[in-house]
Amino acid sequence: MSDAQQVPAIVILGQGALDTARRVQARYPGALVHGLAGRVEADRSYTDFGDTLRELYCADHPIVALCAAGIVIRSLAPLLQRKGAEPPVLALAEDGSAVVPLLGGLAGVNRLAREIGEVLAVAPAITTSGELRFGTCVLNPPAGYVLADLEQGKRFVADLLGGQPVRVEGTAGWLDAARLPRDPAAALAIHVTPSARAPRAEELLIHPRCVLAALEPADAAADAVRRMLVDAGLA
């Protein structure tokens, strides 16, 4: 997980899941295990599983639920048509034998699943086409990078999956290991640049986070820094 992303909430229904939950918790300092009241002693107790998942989801909090995937899907289904935050959500078998990413492909759920899979020594059940084919999700850059336009990015990846080649302009080490269909003469381009501009057609524009400014929380200089970035043409 990136440094900026919250640690997951680990939600269990009974005592049988507690050992696995504690193993996952050890991977994420600060993570809490939420347990059903009267069934298991955990860090926090809840009385309604569905309400708890929905509250965490609406708060944009990553969720690791140790139960059947169907229970998680039915609990969150009323929220899935709403636009807004979609945090990573995955289902984990109580015995740690299966790790299933469900939601949040653009929020790092596959990365979370791989991390948990390493802890439990199991391969996560990743189904994201782009990640399986290219070895990375170009729409979910690692810490230190950000997409300029997510919606354009979705169309871009659809073209890649359709078989179009791509060229990479700029430097990003995480792209070097990707299994992208590269062609220096390709019409599609991944452009890594700090320059603030609108993406061109057939381009995936990625900005590296390369400016550091130390300010107090209420420092009026924050607005001045933003203006300086705009004046310098930096994203």
Where are these regions (language model features)?
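A short beta-strand-loop structural module common to alpha/beta enzyme folds
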Residues: 30-44
